């Protein structure tokens, strides 16, 4: 009887080591999935409401976002759709929506890697790329919007409101998710 068949199979300690590495990778990918889902939710909250900027004077209260402008004069509030007349407004809208869509793809890629194509690295690369791309799109939108508001409202006392902050949080969360996925790739 030959004992060579014992050397074909990994030792029990190697099997446990491999299981531990797989567990670490799975936990990291679950963390990345949660972060990516949070980034999508934060970006939805950031894009939808008319609360990117708030202006509050003695006679007028006004707040607006990417799509709607609301004005309150003597307790009468009116809201109307904002026309994106200038190119920078169209660019901010486009970058915000692209960021949301690309982050949705990142969620899909992370789910694919975690549950369906566990040993396919290209799916992980796509998840990493889309997560970082979504963050970059949102960064461009936020930076352009803030620069233009600071220029156009230089003589007006205004504050950035919660939806603007949620877009920034979505961007940071997207970068964090991409970083966690990148780190999990080094563990594989």
What kind of feature is each model-predicted range?
Residues 16, 45-93:
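A surface-exposed beta-alpha-beta supersecondary segment
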Residues 75-80, 84-87, 146-164:
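Interfacial non-cytosolic loop connecting adjacent transmembrane helices
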């Amino acid at each position: 009887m030959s004992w060579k068949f014992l050397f074909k199979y990994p030792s029990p300690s190697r099997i446990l080591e491999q299981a531990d590495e797989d567990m670490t990778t799975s936990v990291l990918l679950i963390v990345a999935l949660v972060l990516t889902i949070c980034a999508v939710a934060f970006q939805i909250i950031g894009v939808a409401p008319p609360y990117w900027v708030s202006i509050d004077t003695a006679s007028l209260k006004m707040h607006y976002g990417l799509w709607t402008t609301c004005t309150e004069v003597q307790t009468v509030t009116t809201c109307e759709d904002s026309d994106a007349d200038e190119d920078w407004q169209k660019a901010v809208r486009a970058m915000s929506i692209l960021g949301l869509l690309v982050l949705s793809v990142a969620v899909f890629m992370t789910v694919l890697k975690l549950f369906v194509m566990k040993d396919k690295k290209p799916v992980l690369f796509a998840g990493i790329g889309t997560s970082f791309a979504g963050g970059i799109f949102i960064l461009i939108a936020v930076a352009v919007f803030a620069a233009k508001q600071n220029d156009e409202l230089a003589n007006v006392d205004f504050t950035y409101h919660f939806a603007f902050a949620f877009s920034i949080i979505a961007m940071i969360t997207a970068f964090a998710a991409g970083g966690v996925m990148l780190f999990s790739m080094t563990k594989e």
